[in-house]
Amino acid sequence: MSGEYDDLKRRMDGAIAAFKHDLASLRTGRASSNLLDAIQVQAYGTTMPINQVANVTVPEPRMISVSIWDKSMVGAVDRAIRESNLGFNPIVDGTNLRIPLPELNEQRRKELVKISHGYAENARVAARHVRRDGMDFLKKAEKDGVISEDDQRKRSDQVQKLTDETISTIDHLLSDKEAEIMQV
């Protein structure tokens, strides 16, 4: 039975990790190489992530630098960044692109907070799905006579506690990100 609990814990941790990754992709006014993670580039007849055709670094707090490995890919990477709806305007400098980050206005900050709330809700839903799977497993185990009713209740309480801790972590991460976004 502890194997199932460990699996639930791993899946809950996965929901938190996915939420952290989503939050990292939100632009908060500070440069981060994660901001470009979602950008796909048309390269060599296929679509690939930007980090497979270039090196993304942050030389300054408000600047992202993209060092493209193949000179023929400069135009494709530039186009992918401009068309990404992130509001970036790269400056081409040989095989490097420099991306200055403008200040976020109040409206954009509120939009980002709203987006982060959506990410948080998706993470909470994922945690609840894991809880439901755990509860269903326990009910089936009790019905099949593998565990007693008391064991089922005790383990259900453990699953609920794990879910509450996961949702609490998600809420804490969300409030930290909100504060970071709204910081002027």
UniProtKB/Swiss-Prot annotation:
UniProt xrefs under PANTHER family: MITOCHONDRIAL RIBOSOME RECYCLING FACTOR PSEUDO 1 (PTHR20982:SF3), RIBOSOME RECYCLING FACTOR (PTHR20982)
Family per record: Belongs to the RRF family.
What NCBIfam families does the annotation carry?
frr (TIGR00496)
Taxonomic superkingdom: Bacteria
GO MF annotations in UniProt: ribosomal large subunit binding
Q: Name one GO cellular component term.
A: cytosol
Query: What GO biological process, any one, is recorded here?
Result: cytoplasmic translational termination
This molecule's function is given as: Responsible for the release of ribosomes from messenger RNA at the termination of protein biosynthesis. May increase the efficiency of translation by recycling ribosomes from one round of translation to another.
Q: What is this protein called?
A: Ribosome-recycling factor
Q: Name one Pfam family in it.
A: RRF
Subcellular localization is given as: Cytoplasm
Coiled coil residues, start to end:
none
